[in-house]
């Protein structure tokens, strides 16, 4: 008896399917209640409850399964049901500020069917949004359960887009038991076209005067403008808003008339009142952060002259860190008549002390330094008697932090932060202010648009479409507006860095670059101008001493003189013709054409400038970068290098220049160590300090000790040990015991300092601190040799090894050496064959991630870079440049060391070696070292001197299509035509000198014989009177049979590399089991292979009517593919499988007499001889 089948409303099946289900479904749909029917197969009827005969049905339901949204909830969160029946996410434990959740996971659709209470989108680069469908809990994670905030006080999470995902970040500390409520970040809300949460405004009094004490207090973290009562979620937005009020106040007329005019036009406008004492205290707390808050002094009346004029705005382009602190001297208890702009400024500063609900404003303020700096930008306090600016270090000991509120990235100044903040709105059309007129692409920065126009909408040649040409860089544009916007100034690089002498096209780029060099520490004693380097300051100070008149621009304009005569004119180098922006830069460049007068006393290397020499010292002492400034100067001074440049071409007296070497006996000074050494040896008869290893001499003992570090492996003087402290584990040298002990922490293996961004761990805290510079992407360590910037000192030290040629990391497989360990590890992966990175689009694997990323461009953007010579396409510009360099850039003709073939490009040489000498690429010399001497195969053991074969230069110029046609033509030649092929000119083949060009042209041709198991083929002729065949004749008719070896190689054709006659006395072959011999007939073209030593014996024959040739194949694969000794490889293991040749096919040479020494015939033995064809 079968169990009954259960049907539910809507046709859903309980036990199994029935054909009558649709009828039951229709019956159920007519009723208002859900009806469940039971189909009984015994009585063939439906029952609404149970069958009278069989009884009730046992119901089995599925076990309860949580949805994806509820099962993905973190352990420190829980879902609670509220009183109104809704559900919310609550914190089980306290969540600190800046805690990030995400990414938000859901099904992504192009458009919503129904918008949810808290819609989310992701804006792509093309501007089209992708919507998040949060209708199904099984498609989303727990973040869909977080309810949106309705008021600012409820919000504790901020939603924002980062990349192609959406994240939630806590905007304040969330205590345990608090519900999580989310709303959009400021810029994300602008993209989503959603309003920001606003605080309810306070009621305005009947008189129209707003009282700050009566205003409604905003929630924590909200900022209210006291001028217009607008509310802002972030302090930076309030700052930018307040600057607009200040601009309006600045444009109004000053004095009491302004006040009256404003009252007449706007009768309902609130009157401005003097600030209260509390507001004045707030002003002081904002302005002075370096010292603790002090109570205002009582009982002292201020002087009338102390009253300051209102604050005004000046447009300052300098970064915010160069703006001085502003200290106002308005007494807090002295009421002053306030103008509207003063009142606005007081409201601004009074509000900026802290949010209005904060009880203590001063301790909370240091947490918002970036906002204060952004507001103080450009504010200068002026007086009637002039401008007074007091420079105070900003924020004292408090470190300035410019942090992005969206992604938490930290910047050095507010201008970089403001530029970065716009990048978060790069996908929203509303945030992009600059539009490309050609492709309508939007950009948030003007610099990005300029770069886009120069790269995407310009060419280097003028044509009918691109007819607007830039006079500076030569680029052409399709539209005139694009050329005007381009505004190229690349050739007019008039701004030079004083630290590293690099040139920049704009002053703003130079200012950004100067931040890499740190603070300006050296001031001119005459004009107090600050410099980064002391030598540059001294050079500047000489201009004052020389009486150079400093002319102000105002004086020139007043006198009517032309400004052109004082403008820096471009100057060209008289030696090389290079043009510089001014004569001073050209004079610095002229030093490169002169003598290298600054010599390293340790290694003897010479330099043009002393600052480059001082940077070079880091190569010898790796830990010198860890010293502070005082220790570094003292240590460098010990080895005889001063911080001043000794310019021999200077017009000043010798006494004005500092000297490095001073004689203690006669008080004479010298600029170079060699001059000082010569002086003490000739005048005072002193020997100095000599190195017993390299026999160099030094005047100073400290320089001698520093030099001895080079000979650290063979130190003769025990006193030098105080300068040398080697590590017993790795052998690295340190100049102090403290640095050595600190270095030993690396070898303990304990890495207790982890990076929070990438998870990498380090043994020391200073190593972690140095590693953090990698994430900042600031390259402040410049190479003194090439000017390349590095992120860390460690990277600079390794980079300097490239200039020195130091390669200390060796591959244990192929013994190739590298300067950096990371490059060696990448190279070693090629030996292991490990490929950890796979392309998810095509399944191809790679050993390096960057190689895989480059490969993915084939699937995404395709091959966009085309070679103008051969029309090959490449993914990246670098690959195209590499192709042109290797393939099309002609170099001096190179000859193959094995066969003498000449090629003109590196790619041709690589192709030649791969096709003609594949064993050189596959077999290393190290693999043959363990073999016995008797098995070594070389030219002496074979007894054949190979001729030097090569191709003519004219033949190399032919394309590969011409070569293919030439090969096809040669294969169609008849045997009698091939018999007339010439022989290369050689001392052995002197009877064929006139036919060398024809022969050499055919030797280098490509064939199908890319054979791994064949190293060399020597073809010899039996009769010197018979014309020798060409290199490919006689082997093309060999019967092809698949050959199985240990390596699994197969080949179809063979290519000889030398052709000649075999004579008994001078060309005797020393055959062994490693040589495979093929005997072939020059007339019929048939061939036989011999694989034993006694198969071919050379002895004179009376006459050779049917001359034969012998080809000897020297097999190197048998040396490396088998462990068996060489003598047993062919005879016992038979690594090659041959097919026997019938005896009737064996060529039997006639036994006619012939002159000895002139005809050589291979003796073919009878039944015992094994002859095979392939």
Curated annotation (Swiss-Prot):
Residues 75-185 form the SET domain. PANTHER family: ZINC FINGER PROTEIN, ZINC FINGER PROTEIN 672-RELATED. SUPFAM superfamilies: beta-beta-alpha zinc fingers (SSF57667). Residues 261-271 have a biased composition (Basic and acidic residues). It is an enzyme of class 2 (transferase). Residues 644-655 have a biased composition (Acidic residues). CDD domains: PR-SET_PRDM15. The keyword Magnesium does not apply. Residues 252-307, 639-658, 957-1007, 1147-1174 are annotated as: Disordered. Its EC number is 2.1.1.-. A zinc finger (C2H2-type) spans 402-424, 434-457, 468-486, 495-517, 522-544, 571-593, 598-620, 661-684, 689-711, 725-747, 753-775, 781-803, 809-831, 837-859, 865-888. It is found in: Nucleus. Expressed in embryonic stem cells (ESCs) (at protein level). Residues 1154-1174 have a biased composition (Low complexity). Keywords: Activator, Developmental protein, DNA-binding, Isopeptide bond, Metal-binding, Methyltransferase, Nucleus, Repeat, Repressor, S-adenosyl-L-methionine, Transcription, Transcription regulation, Transferase, Ubl conjugation, Zinc, Zinc-finger. This is PR domain zinc finger protein 15.
